[in-house]
Curated annotation (Swiss-Prot):
Name of the gene encoding the protein in the UniProt record: mdtC
A molecular function GO annotation: xenobiotic transmembrane transporter activity
Claim: Cell inner membrane is one of the keywords in the record: yes
Domain of life: Bacteria
Record keyword Transport present: yes
Keyword vocabulary terms for this entry: Cell inner membrane, Cell membrane, Membrane, Transmembrane, Transmembrane helix, Transport
GO CC entries: plasma membrane
Quaternary data: Part of a tripartite efflux system composed of MdtA, MdtB and MdtC. MdtC forms a heteromultimer with MdtB.
The name this protein goes by in its record: Multidrug resistance protein MdtC
Membrane topology according to the record: Multi-pass membrane protein
Originating organism: Shigella sonnei (strain Ss046)
InterPro entries for the chain: AcrB_DN_DC_subdom, Acrflvin-R, Multidrug-R_MdtC
Similarity comment: family membership: Belongs to the resistance-nodulation-cell division (RND) (TC 2.A.6) family. MdtC subfamily.
Length: 1025
């Protein structure tokens, strides 16, 4: 009593306290970062190593395996995957959430150093690492185009000047430059000319290496001067290499230009990048795992004018893709939804109280509670994101509940003739415990979420804490500011109603009278209500088992990613043509704004595309509908497949795949894996629950298998080392020398001129110089025949692995797909030597599925414990919790009605309903207990009177929560796919709960009382008119 009086009789102090809360909130709001979702990125580090010309199997055994054995010893590694392709190995390390990325990077570098002695000596450079997840979509893509500069020159500008500067920007984790390679001097050899001159490829390599050296020459000194010695020991351009003497034949000099075409070109000619049908260099920028995407993008944009000045005017630098506009638009939509929710909630209060003066009170208390929450969010290190803003939107209905309960009870005393200050004190005292019970039991719902681990726990923690803080501030405001304003603003007389509102008042009275009559009937037919209650419990179980489930709603971020997978024997020239064809099909779609893509590198038969869609208000279709439309057009392109998926804000794992979900096959027996993977993939491709089924196992690449006759080689004076060196020199784009320039280092690349390697007859033109100096054709000691070979070798841990990726067809959920895959694996009878498991997002979904029911039970148990402590009773909490089954049925039926799967967002809605719907029962039980203790009423009369007296605040709080959530259901635009499941769940649960709990709660209350009476042998009582 004294606590409430302290604030009611000291209005200045109470107002200043509220102003202080508001000012802190405004300050926190201005400093809060902006993000699409809470920070849930796993720390990921990518290790890269190269050995030009080495086969995928060689890279896997000699490079990947030694590195994996060393890296696998690092503490906190939750997953390690690797992929080895032609001349390249990439190892992805995913760490536990709590692992510091910088500390992990130091451990990775130490592990690389430890494995260095086990790696091949011919590697051109040491393995390197990057603190970025290569499977994440870039946060920004920049393109360089020019009508004047070559692709190699553009790549040089990008990698030498732009990429290092961008990499230094806070938040940037990796800048991947694609579309070409660094400039190089390329030496294209003529095999016939070499044979005629008696010059071997090793002779050419040695001559070039010896002619281009950079060594210290020292200095000369006399008594007074010192001269630095400088020589022309370096060759820098193709024109300087052309006249180089590489051999003497019959006394005549054989120059490099006599046996080769020397050009200024690029290191790897098998790379291509494009933007909107124009050749381009791409800078794909990814953020650090812990970085804020909006801040990082803003920092990059601020740096762009400076970057533009560092490159020639003839080079056009453009932003091809930027993730931030969609994120900003989504947050603006949520902010608008929040404002609408506040307005609707205040409208509900006005309609029920029919007093402008009384409506001002919640109109002040609600913003104070919400704005004050921003200060706590800032102190907790949170961000303004879709989930935290949705928490505030939902909190609108919660925070007004406390004010409504206090305000309505004070208004009732005023209408009875009590003086304002006395009514404020008495009314607050009567409902203070009720408000405290509602708030604490609501916060208790979120305690299991705060203790939940893994990605779901990290994702939901910010939502739970934000909502809990808002409820806590609301509790403080409703017991301080609200009664003070009631005492000083409201009048003792009954407020005058506007004529247009009298009809609503009469309707409310009629509704209350009708409820009273129906309640009397129900209380005399309790068995029927008991059956209904038991039926809702059973229906909950059935609906939860049968409803489709998924991990997270499929987002429309306005960005699509496409992975191209062509025939495994396709040439680079044909693959570049496929890229152009696919880009044209997509570019012609009316919903597409921009298309960029690239192909080449170590995987000639694959490519990537990044598609920016037009803003949401400029297109009528969702991203998934656009994918469905494009899938039909793309299927007509022969010889290649393009798999499209919408970029998501949440992506788990480091695997680069062509679809959103993955199923990984592991085996210690590589032969068994290669036997069963095609069978499993073909089976999964027939399932209607899956779409775009593809695999990263590519073991049907074309290979030319050479078999050496070692006896003949020994007789001819040729060793295997010389033969292998010949092949590497001829076909491996061998980097044989380095050109040092002030800004970068460039390579001299040697191979047989592509004009002489158009078919397998090129092998017949190759020869080796034996130990007697004679030219021995390759065909003398080797035979060759076509064969199949893997284009990539993949590992997970240290086991051979193959990952099957898939998307979901329209109308199918992840639970449908998971169940179908499990059935297919059982039907196929896959041996125990091949193990299958879901990976990435699908794996997290499986883990979340196993914990959802436990989480809901834990929330209910926590609420029961809190209520039991507050009421000092084992029974009354059960009465209050009896409201939950009807809310669950309503939520699940609403999801089914709107064809929305049960996701993590819907789970949040269920948890919220546990907190919301019990408020009705708390208000009933509190007043019934009070009436029994002080009014000398029977339990039946007490609960009946409590239901009637609390009917208006129950209707007000329920409608306030309903109208607070309704904008989430009705909102459109960016990010609406996240808001809809939450709104649908809450609205459906509230509607069903309101219809049933007004009757089931008093029946359950009397049921437990009759149990008490039966044990104490008291006579049964009935309700009288």
């Amino acid at each position: 009593m004294k606590f409430f009086a302290l604030f009611i009789y000291r209005p200045v102090a109470t107002i200043l306290l509220s102003v202080a809360i508001t000012l802190c909130g405004i300050l926190g709001f201005r400093m809060l970062p902006v993000a699409p979702l809470p920070q849930v990125d796993f720390p990921v580090i990518m290790v890269s190593a190269s050995l030009p010309g080495a086969s995928p199997e060689t890279m896997a055994s000699s490079v990947a395996t030694p590195l994996e054995r060393s890296l696998g010893r690092i503490a906190g590694v939750s997953e390690m995957t690797s992929s080895s392709s032609l001349g390249s190995t990439r190892i992805i390390l995913q760490f536990d959430f709590d692992r510091d990325i910088n500390g992990a990077a130091r451990d990775v570098q130490a592990a690389i150093n430890a494995a260095q002695s086990l790696l091949p000596s011919g590697m051109p450079s040491r393995p390197t690492y990057r603190k970025a997840n290569p499977s994440d979509a870039p946060i920004m893509i920049l393109t360089l185009t020019s009508d004047t500069y070559s692709q190699g020159e553009l790549y040089d500008f990008a990698s030498t000047q732009l990429a290092p500067t961008i990499s230094q920007i806070d938040g940037v984790g990796d800048v991947d430059v694609g579309g070409s390679s660094l400039p190089a001097v390329r030496v294209g050899l003529n095999p016939q000319a070499l044979f005629n001159q008696g010059v071997s490829l090793d002779d050419v390599r040695t001559a070039i290496s010896n002619a281009n050296v950079r060594k210290p020459q020292g200095a000369l000194e006399d008594g007074t001067h010192r001269w630095q010695i400088q020589t022309n020991d370096e060759l820098k351009t193709a024109a300087e290499y052309q006249p180089l003497i590489i051999h003497y034949n019959n006394g005549g000099a054989v120059r490099l230009g006599d046996v080769a075409t020397v050009t200024d070109s690029v290191q790897d000619v098998r790379n291509a990048g494009m933007t909107n049908a124009k050749p381009a260099i791409l800078l794909m920028i990814r953020k650090l795992p812990e970085a804020n995407i909006i801040q990082t993008v803003d920092s990059i944009r601020a740096k762009l004018p400076e970057l533009q000045e560092t490159i020639p005017a003839a080079i056009d630098l453009q932003i091809a893709q930027d993730r931030s506009p969609t994120i900003r638009a989504s947050l603006e939509e949520v902010e608008q939804t929040l404002i609408i929710s506040v307005a609707l909630v205040i409208l509900v209060v006005f309609l029920f109280l029919r007093s402008g003066r009384a409506t001002i009170i919640p109109a002040v208390s609600v913003p104070v509670s919400l704005i004050g929450t921003f200060a706590a969010m800032y102190l907790c290190g949170f961000s303004l994101n879709n989930l935290s803003l949705m928490a505030l939107t939902i909190a609108t209905g919660f925070v007004v509940d406390d004010a409504i309960v206090v305000l309505e009870n004070i208004a009732r005393h005023l209408e009875a003739g009590m003086k304002p200050l006395q009514a404020a004190l008495q009314g607050t005292r009567e409902v203070g415990f009720t408000v405290l019970s509602m708030s604490l039991s609501l916060v208790a719902v979120f305690l299991p979420l705060l203790l939940m681990g893994g990605l779901p726990g990290r994702l939901l923690r910010e939502f739970a804490v934000t909502l809990s803080v808002a409820i806590g501030i609301s509790l403080l405001v409703s017991l301080t500011l609200t009664p003070m304003m009631c005492g000083w603003m409201l009048k003792a007389s009954k407020p005058r109603e506007q004529k247009r509102l009298r009809g609503f008042g009469r309707m409310l009275v009629a509704l209350q009278q009708g409820y009273g009559k129906s309640l009397k009937w129900v209380l005399n037919h309790t068995r029927l209500v008991g059956v209904v209650l038991l039926g809702t419990i059973a229906l909950n179980i059935w609906l939860y088992i049968s409803i489709p489930k998924t991990f997270f709603p499929e987002q429309d971020t306005g960005v699509l990613m496409g992975g191209i997978q062509a025939d495994q024997s396709i040439s680079f020239q044909a693959m570049r043509g496929k890229l152009q064809d696919f880009m044209k099909i997509i570019r012609d779609d009316p919903a597409v704004d921009n298309v960029t893509g690239f192909t080449g590198g170590s995987r000639v038969n694959s490519g990537m595309m990044f598609i920016t869609l037009k803003p949401r208000d400029e297109r009528s279709e969702t991203a998934q509908q656009i994918i469905d439309r494009l899938r039909v057009k793309l299927a007509k392109e022969p010889g290649a497949n393009l798999f499209l998926m919408a970029v998501q804000d949440i992506r788990v794992g480091g695997r680069q795949s062509n679809a959103s979900y993955q199923y990984t096959l592991l085996s210690d027996d590589l032969a068994a894996l290669r036997e069963w993977e095609p069978k499993i993939r073909k089976k999964l491709a027939t399932l209607p629950e899956l779409a775009d089924v593809n695999s990263d196992q590519q073991d049907n690449g074309a290979e030319m298998n050479l078999v050496y006759d070692r006896d003949t080689m020994a007789r001819l004076g040729i060793d295997v080392q010389a033969a292998n060196s010949l092949l590497n020199n001829a076909f491996g784009q061998r980097q044989i020398s380095t050109i040092y320039q002030p800004m970068n280092q460039y390579k001299v690349v040697m191979e047989v001129d592509p004009r002489y390697t158009q078919d397998i007859s090129a092998l017949e033109k190759m020869f080796v110089i034996n130990n007697e100096g004679k030219a021995i054709p390759l065909s003398y000691f080797a035979k060759w025949q076509p064969a199949n070979a893997p284009l990539s070798v993949n590992h997970q841990g240290l086991s051979a692995a193959s990952t099957i990726s898939f998307n979901l067809p329209t109308g199918k959920s992840l639970s449908d797909a998971s169940a179908a895959i499990d059935r297919a694996m059982t039907q196929l009878g896959v041996p125990s030597t091949v193990r299958g498991s879901f990976a990435g997002t699908a794996q997290v979904f499986q883990e979340t599925m196993n914990s959802q029911v436990i989480l809901i039970i834990a929330a209910i148990a926590t609420v029961y414990i809190v209520l039991g402590i507050l009421y000092e009773s084992y029974v009354h909490p059960l009465t209050i919790l009896s409201t939950l089954p009807s809310a669950g049925v309503g939520a699940l039926l609403a999801l089914e009605l709107f064809n929305a799967p049960f996701s993590l967002i819907a789970l949040i809605g269920i948890m919220l309903l546990i907190g919301i719907v019990k408020k009705n029962a708390i208000m009933m039980v509190d007043f019934a207990l009070e009436a029994q203790r002080h009014g000398n009423l029977t339990p039946q009369e007490a609960i009946f009177q409590a239901c009637l007296l609390r009917f208006r605040p129950i209707m007000m709080t329920t409608l306030a929560a309903l109208f607070g959530a309704l904008p989430l259901v009705l909102s459109g635009g960016d990010g609406s796919e996240l808001r809809h499941p939450l709104g649908i769940t809450i609205v459906g649960g509230l509607v069903m709960s309101q219809l049933l709990t007004l009757y089931t709660t008093p029946v359950v209350y009397l049921f437990f009382d009759r149990l008490r009476l039966r044990f104490s042998r008291k006579p049964k009582q009935t309700v009288t008119e």
